[in-house]
C-alpha cells in the first residue's frame, strides 16, 4: 500500500544506529497512536511495543517483531529518499520490516473485533549488534507471549514468494 511505502521511505531517510533510534521510535509511536493503538514506550531504551487485544475470547498472545536499527554505512544509492544521516543507512531492510509491521498493525487494529487473544507488535531496537532483544526479555515485556514471529526481506527470493527458514 501507499502508506507502507511512505513509511518505508521516511524510515529509510531517517536511518539511525543501534541504541540511537530515538527519531525512529518517535515516528513509530506517533503512527501507532494515530491509529488508536496502545503503545508501550521506554524511558531507558528505544523501540516500542504496541498491543492489540482481540474482541473475541482467547488467552493466547502472539508477538510480531520487526527490527528498526540501521548500519554504519554511507549511502550512495541515489534514491530520492536516501539517508539524511551521513554514514548511516538501512542496508539490511529494517526500514522495510518496520514499515510492513506498521501496515500489519493497521490491518490487525481494523479487524481487532474478529481476533481471539492478543497480538503484540515489537519494534525492536539494536538488532544489528545482537543484543536488542535481551532488554525486552529481561524486563519481562514478553513473558505473556505464546508464539513469536518475525520476517526479513530477502533480495534473492522472487517477488511474491514466501521463504520459510527452520
Language-model segments: residues:
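Acidic/His- and Gly-rich active-site-bordering loop/insert found
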Residues: 1-90, 99, 103-115
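Histidine/acidic-residue-rich, glycine-tolerant segments that coordinate divalent metal ions
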Residues: 71, 79-89, 96, 113-166
Amino acid at each position: 500500500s501507499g502508506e507502507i511505502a511512505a513509511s518505508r521511505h521516511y524510515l529509510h531517510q531517517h536511518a539511525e544506529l543501534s541504541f540511537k533510534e530515538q527519531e525512529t521510535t518517535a515516528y513509530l509511536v506517533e503512527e501507532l497512536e494515530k491509529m488508536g493503538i496502545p503503545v508501550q514506550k521506554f524511558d531507558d531504551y528505544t523501540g516500542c511495543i504496541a498491543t492489540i487485544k482481540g474482541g473475541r475470547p482467547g488467552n493466547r498472545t502472539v508477538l510480531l517483531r520487526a527490527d528498526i536499527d540501521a548500519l554504519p554505512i554511507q549511502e550512495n544509492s541515489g534514491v530520492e529518499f536516501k539517508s539524511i544521516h551521513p554514514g548511516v543507512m538501512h542496508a539490511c531492510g529494517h526500514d522495510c520490516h518496520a514499515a510492513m509491521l506498521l501496515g500489519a498493525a493497521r490491518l490487525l487494529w481494523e479487524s481487532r473485533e474478529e481476533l481471539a487473544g492478543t497480538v503484540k507488535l515489537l519494534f525492536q531496537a539494536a538488532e544489528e549488534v545482537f543484543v536488542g532483544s535481551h532488554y525486552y526479555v529481561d524486563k519481562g515485556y514478553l513473558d505473556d507471549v505464546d508464539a513469536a514471529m518475525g520476517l526479513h526481506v530477502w533480495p534473492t527470493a522472487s517477488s511474491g514468494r514466501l521463504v520459510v527458514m527452520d
